[in-house]
């Protein structure tokens, strides 16, 4: 009799749990794509289980932001990725790393997005580090970037706070890939952009000093821009600028070399050592000229004598 009662009790508990899960599924099946708020309830390996009030949801390891730490009883907001009703019964899957989490935060924070005056055209995210979001306005009088930033940056600050200080770049959308790349790679100044429509590659040329800005830390800026516009963005330094600079140096060095009777190679070495004019050559010690040009010191003295002769003439 006791075993039968125990079995009946276990069966009843299982049915109750199943009924609760079915209620969960019915309540949440249409809420995929929303943001919900809950309390961290427990951990199972790297998965986080979150109490949503009546029900428990799970944020799997793959949906976590790797730079975030969670503790029991922490209140967190998350995006409902899916409501599944398979194998183990109904389950609510949450995410804080999904790009649509950022999308929904903007929709709740920016009234112009909520009323569809401003549209989010594209979004690319490396959760915990950086997000790029491209926005467009139906109304010419409404600045889409300004609307998202808010007065004194209030709107975007609220979003960044929710994302634990993840960088958020808000970009003006353009149907022209060139214009969009130029916006997305700011603050780097673009020297030239060429498009390979067949391979969907954007070749971007920047100056030496802008190269690291355009590529970003560990290539992040260029990588996110590629995802944002759905083209492969390849950034390279402007070699022609360097070539023009080298040509000017070589030309000036050649002129100096002709005056002093030096080969182009020695003249270039002298020029790079600081001997840009005859007057500056005369200020250089003979031993310094000798070591810079890799010549014996008597030859360095001959160069100085020639420079002295030319300036005195």
Task: Give the label of every model feature segment.
Residues 1-313:
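RNA-contacting regions in translation and RNA-metabolism proteins
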């Amino acid at each position: 009799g006791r075993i039968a009662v125990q079995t009946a009790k276990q069966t009843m508990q299982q049915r109750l749990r199943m009924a609760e899960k079915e209620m969960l599924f019915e309540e949440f099946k249409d809420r995929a794509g929303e943001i919900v708020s809950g309390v961290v309830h427990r951990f199972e390996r790297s998965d986080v289980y979150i109490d949503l009030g009546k029900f428990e949801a799970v944020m799997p390891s793959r949906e976590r932001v790797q730079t975030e730490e969670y503790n029991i009883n922490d209140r967190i907001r998350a995006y409902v990725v899916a409501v599944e009703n398979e194998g183990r019964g109904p389950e609510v899957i949450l995410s804080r790393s999904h790009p649509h989490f950022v999308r929904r935060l903007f929709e709740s924070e920016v009234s112009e997005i909520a009323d569809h005056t401003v549209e989010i055209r594209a979004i690319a995210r490396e959760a915990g580090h950086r997000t790029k979001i491209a926005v467009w306005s139906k109304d010419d009088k409404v600045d889409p970037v300004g609307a998202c930033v808010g007065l004194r940056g209030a709107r975007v600050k609220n979003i960044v706070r929710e994302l634990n200080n993840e960088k958020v770049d808000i970009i003006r959308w353009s149907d022209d890939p060139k214009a969009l790349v130029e916006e997305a790679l700011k603050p780097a100044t673009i020297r030239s952009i060429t498009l390979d429509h067949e391979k969907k590659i954007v070749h971007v040329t920047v100056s030496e000093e802008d190269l690291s800005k355009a590529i970003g830390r560990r290539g992040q800026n260029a990588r996110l821009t590629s995802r944002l516009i759905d083209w492969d963005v390849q950034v390279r330094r402007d070699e022609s600028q360097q070539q023009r600079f080298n040509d000017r140096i070589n030309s000036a060095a050649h002129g100096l070399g002709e005056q002093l009777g030096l080969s182009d190679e020695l003249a270039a070495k002298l020029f790079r050592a600081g001997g840009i004019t005859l007057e500056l050559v005369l200020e250089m010690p003979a031993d310094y000229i000798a070591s810079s040009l890799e010549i014996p010191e008597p030859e360095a003295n001959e160069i100085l004598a020639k420079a002295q002769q030319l300036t005195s003439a």
